[in-house]
Structures are given as C-alpha cells and as structure tokens.
C-alpha cells in the first residue's frame, strides 16, 4: 500500500490532541527495539494486517479498539518507507547508530538522524513487516523490526496530520 494524502489512517485508544503530542526522538531505553520515544503510532484503515488485527489476534488491549482517531496526512509529508528487508538495511547503513546493549546486533536506527533529514514519519508496509520482523539471513550487524508487529506508521511531526475525526468515547 502506498500512503498518500487520500489514505485514511487510524490510531486506537487515543483521541489525538495536538497540545499533548510528544515529538518523536531517539530513546536510549527503546533503541534496542528500533522504536522512538514519542510520536503518533497508527495503521492504514485498509491495512490487511494493522494494529486492530494484531491486537485482536494477540488479545492485547482489545478494550482500546472501541475508540480512537481517524485522520490523513498532508500531501507534502515525507515518510521513510520500509517496504522490504533491503530498505531496512539501507536505513541502518544511513541512519544506524551503535548500541552495544543489543545482544545480537550492533546497529539500531537513530531516529534523531532520520528526523534531522526532514522525515515526518516512518512507514513499515505489510511486506516490510513480514520481511523485517525476524529475518533469519541478515548481516550480523543489522537489527530487525521485531517490535513493530504489524503494518504501521510512527509520525514524528504533528503538523502533517489533517482531516481529524474521532470515534468512540475518549479514554482518560
């Protein structure tokens, strides 16, 4: 799936609030799982294996699936797209940073560097998730995206979010 300004995105259990948005940044605590601290996590509504599917299959926070936010992103949004394992390797070569706390791999994504390069978010496609979740034949230096679980995006920049609608009751 290609993400365009027409693609409807969804996040569950969150009524997006611009005032409470926490900008994404590199996290020493989360770097080993290749996730930034902050940002807004979402999946395409039309995804064949998105957040709602993973939560339902794993019986994870299913109560949160009753409410959330639907939105789109602006046409000029710049996304780092990981649609295959080679895309992840290229991103690790360009934006990789050493993290020796990671037992098996020495390079993880440096989200501060990705953001500094002007990216508004990162999109892991369904095929990208399949290939990058637990690759068995990658180079020893390369980490994976095992903790991403499904086709998803993490948005670093709240200013690209538009056409917001809420559903369900807001969780406090």
Segments from the language model and where they lie:
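A short, exposed loop/beta-hairpin motif centered on an aromatic-Gly-Thr core
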Residues: 22-43
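Active-site and NAD+-binding cores of ADP-ribose-processing enzymes
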Residues: 2-28, 57-172
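Short active-site loop/helix that positions an aromatic residue
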Residues: 46-62
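A residue-identity detector for tryptophan
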Residues: 41, 49-54, 141, 148
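Helix N-cap/beta->alpha junction signal
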Residues: 44-46, 84
């Amino acid at each position: 799936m290609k993400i365009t300004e027409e693609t409807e995105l969804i996040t569950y259990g969150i009524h997006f609030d611009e005032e409470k948005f926490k900008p994404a940044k590199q996290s020493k605590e989360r770097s080993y799982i290749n996730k930034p601290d902050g940002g807004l996590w979402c999946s395409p509504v039309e995804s064949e294996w998105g957040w709602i599917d993973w939560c339902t299959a794993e019986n994870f926070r299913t109560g949160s699936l009753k409410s959330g936010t639907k939105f789109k992103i602006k046409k000029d949004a710049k996304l780092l797209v990981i649609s295959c394992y080679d895309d992840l390797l290229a991103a690790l070569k360009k934006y990789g940073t050493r993290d020796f706390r990671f037992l098996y791999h020495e390079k993880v994504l440096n989200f501060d560097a990705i953001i500094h390069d002007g990216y508004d978010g990162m999109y892991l496609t369904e095929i990208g998730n399949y290939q990058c979740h637990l690759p068995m034949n990658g180079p020893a230096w390369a980490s994976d995206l095992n903790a991403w679980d499904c086709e998803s995006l993490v948005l670093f920049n709240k200013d690209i979010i538009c056409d917001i609608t809420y559903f369900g009751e807001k969780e406090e």
